[in-house]
Amino acid sequence: MKIEPENEYRDRRSLTNILGMAKRLLGVSIKENGVYADFTMGNGNDTLYIKKMCPSGTIYAFDIQPAALEATKKLLESEGCMDENVHLICDSHANFQKHIPENETLDGAIFNLGYLPGGDKSTTTKTSSTLTCLSGALDMLGPGGVAVVCVYPGHEEGAREGAAILELAEGFDRVGFDCLYHRLVNIPEAPFIVAFQKKIGKTPKFRKIGKISL
C-alpha cells in the first residue's frame, strides 16, 4: 500500500523527489535474472519499474487490497510487462514467506509505506507487520542485495513506523549491513528513506536497541 505524496515529492527535478531517489537506490541491486519483492504493491508503479529494469527477473508483489492487484495487473499488461515471472499476491507482506520459496534469495526489495493512493486512508501499513516483513526480507537478501523503505511520518502510524525502522537500522553492526538514512532536514513531516545493503562476504550482526531485536 502506498501513501499519496504531495506533488512536490513527485518532481523529478527536486530534492524532495523521494520516490525517484528510492528507485535509484533500488537500481543498485538490479541484475539479470534477479529476484525482487515489492512489499507494498499499491497501484503497481514500483513493480513496473523493477520489471522494466530487469525483464528477465522474478518479482513477488504484495498487497492486502484486491483493488491494488487489479490496478497493478492492468498497468503491467498495458506496458507489456505482465508474464509468468510476475507474482501478484493478495496477502499481508508479513506473510511473504508463505509465498516466496524458502530457498529463494532476494536481490532487492522495496517498501512504499502508507495507504493506497485513491483508496481508503484508514487502511494503512502497520508498524508490527512492516517490521516483521522487513526483518524477514533483510534475512533473505543475498550479498549486495538492497532493501529500500519509503516512510511517511506525516500521519500517526507513519511516524511510529519511521521511528521503529530507524531504530532497527541503527541496531545493525556495520560488519554485515550498510544502512542509509535520507531525508529533508528542515521539513520534519517530509517523507524519508531508510535503505539497507547486505555486504558481500560478511555475516550480518545486530546490536539490540530498545525493544527491537532480530
Residue ranges and their predicted role:
Residues M1-A37, N45-K52, E70-E104:
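S-adenosyl-L-methionine
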Residues F39, F62:
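Conserved beta-strand/loop positions that form the S-adenosyl-L-methionine
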Residues Q65:
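Conserved SAM/SAH-binding beta-strand->alpha-helix loop
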Residues I110-C133:
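Mobile active-site "lid"/loop adjacent to the S-adenosyl-L-methionine
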